[in-house]
Amino acid sequence: MRVRTRTGRRAAGALTAAALLLSALSLTGCEADGGHRGSSGRPGAPDGLTDGAPSGREPASAHHPGRGGPVRPAARPDPAPELFRELPGLGPRTREELPDDSGQVLVVTGTGHDSSRSTVVLYERVAADKKNHRTRSGTGDAGAAWRAGASWMAHNGLRGWTERHHQGDLRSPIGVFGLTGSGGRRKDPGTLLPYDHAPRAFTIHGSGSEGEPLSGSFGYVVAIDYNRRSGTSPLDPVRPMGGHRGGGIWLHVDHGGPTQGCVSLSRKNMKSLLLTLDPRRRPVVVMGDSASLAR
């Protein structure tokens, strides 16, 4: 399957009827399976995630009583973004897997090896500016640093993480993977990634592990380059390592519970991610539980 470009975003309509009728459930590791129970305790929740605030931003303070009623303190400008010489939480073995020319790294950190909860932060490589930014010390290129974006809550596989993913194990794969293709039921929000707008093919029905509806989960999708051909549509069924090693591992819209192996974010954050990722910066995702990433 050839790489889709901006001029070919409507090519999904030219797919054969058989390809369109192929259920998204058979292509993605996030297939519905109502026989498993997760740990969220929020069955049926439409989102289930709380957006994190950008690093360094203070929460709103309480009102102060006065003659004229409640008074808010004067607004303060947001502090300068914090820069890092090294990507936080990644050990030497993990850092060695990162491409030298990657300028965008999405770090997905699981709370535990068997946990379905994780935190997502997008880091972008920038020139270090010691005068205007706080920079944490560490080893690395003295002329470059990593700027952290907002911290987002996410779900991953129901049973946590694994270094050797197999079809149906309900765990998300640990490793560093490219982010080279996107798509979804919703129209292209303006991403620079190749976007496959295929409403019928990205339709999903049924319930998740906690009984929550899965409808809308594939409104926005970014394919994670695990066991797939780089640069193709997320719907590409080819599995270079074989079907037994699973596939269809995506970043997609959260449905309020654990996934079958994908990583899910709120729809707002998925849209923000799509608008930020730039293929010219060779974006990658590094994902796994915190202990595995720290090695």
Segments and roles (model prediction):
Residues 30-253, 275, 290-295:
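Cell wall/extracellular polymer interaction/catalysis modules
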